UniProtKB/Swiss-Prot annotation:
<keyword id="KW-0406">Ion transport</keyword>
<keyword id="KW-0812">Transmembrane</keyword>
<dbReference type="Pfam" id="PF01459">
    <property type="entry name" value="Porin_3"/>
</dbReference>
<dbReference type="InterPro" id="IPR001925">
    <property type="entry name" value="Porin_Euk"/>
</dbReference>
<dbReference type="InterPro" id="IPR027246">
    <property type="entry name" value="Porin_Euk/Tom40"/>
</dbReference>
<comment type="function">
    <text>Putative channel that allows diffusion of small hydrophilic molecules through membranes.</text>
</comment>
<keyword id="KW-1134">Transmembrane beta strand</keyword>
<dbReference type="GO" id="GO:0005741">
    <property type="term" value="C:mitochondrial outer membrane"/>
</dbReference>
<dbReference type="GO" id="GO:0015288">
    <property type="term" value="F:porin activity"/>
</dbReference>
<protein>
    <recommendedName>
        <fullName>Putative mitochondrial outer membrane protein porin 5</fullName>
    </recommendedName>
</protein>
<keyword id="KW-0813">Transport</keyword>
<keyword id="KW-0472">Membrane</keyword>
<keyword id="KW-0626">Porin</keyword>
<dbReference type="GO" id="GO:0008308">
    <property type="term" value="F:voltage-gated monoatomic anion channel activity"/>
</dbReference>
<dbReference type="InterPro" id="IPR023614">
    <property type="entry name" value="Porin_dom_sf"/>
</dbReference>
<comment type="similarity">
    <text>Belongs to the eukaryotic mitochondrial porin (TC 1.B.8.1) family.</text>
</comment>
<keyword id="KW-0496">Mitochondrion</keyword>
Length: 226
């Protein structure tokens, strides 16, 4: 039974997570704690070459509402409040932005997704109609979370199309392997292992198959949840 529409960001989220989540060429460390009242606090430090960054995020769930606040080292504050709804099998949503000064739409996106127990299809018309993104996820084994994914992004104004395929394979309940390859020749892979309960080590890398003479980019991430 539907309790209402989901968030626009959730359309295509399954495919996006498989193709982007935990892929990194940086050095990252994060630690999370949870209080008995339900407040989750996460501190993250990131190093990318000579650039250092950090942020603190807190999350709180009250009944059917989720609160998320994030503050970074530049004192930028991002907050989000949204209801926790059960998604229906077919979901559609629209995201718009309007500039009252220029009286123009700065953003207009439309998305549709169809979800089944073993697969998910989504289509998003974005950039005010200039881009189309279609994705398909198929879960090979729900018990092990293994899945394959394909994504096609078409930029109408530049006549460019990017195709990305990838997948996730659960070696066991503690270890995951992911890989992806796009039509531009970029290949990425990662190994993720839960050494301690809720504490995860991720080693990832990326290489441009069109320039194999260059060294691959590597990343290391450690996430601790006492």
């Amino acid at each position: 039974m539907s309790k209402g529409p989901g968030l626009f960001a959730d359309i295509g989220k399954y495919a996006k997570d498989l193709l982007t989540r935990d892929y990194s060429t940086d050095q990252k460390f994060s630690i999370s704690t949870n209080s008995v009242s339900g407040v989750a606090l996460t501190s993250t430090a990131l190093k990318n070459g000579v650039l250092h960054a950090a942020n603190v995020a807190t999350q709180y769930k009250y009944r059917n509402t989720f609160f998320d606040v994030k503050i970074d080292t530049d004192f930028n504050v991002k907050s989000l409040v949204y209801p926790m709804n059960k998604f229906v099998s077919i979901d559609h949503n629209t995201l718009t932005g309007y500039d009252t000064t220029s009286r123009t739409f700065t953003k207009y996106n439309v998305g549709v997704s169809v979800t089944k127990p073993d697969q998910c299809v989504s289509i998003i018309l974005g950039d005010k109609g200039d881009s189309i993104k279609a994705s398909y996820v198929y879960y090979l084994d729900e018990s092990t979370r293994s899945a394959t994914v394909g994504e096609v992004i078409r930029k109408i104004s530049t006549n460019e199309t990017t195709v990305t395929v990838g997948g996730l394979y659960a070696v066991d309940h503690l270890t995951n392997v992911k890989a992806k390859l796009n039509s531009n020749g970029k290949f990425g892979a990662l190994l993720q292992h839960e050494g301690l309960p809720k504490s995860i080590v991720t080693i990832s890398g990326e290489i441009d198959t069109k320039t194999l003479d260059k060294y691959p980019r590597l990343g290391l991430s450690l996430s601790l949840k006492p």
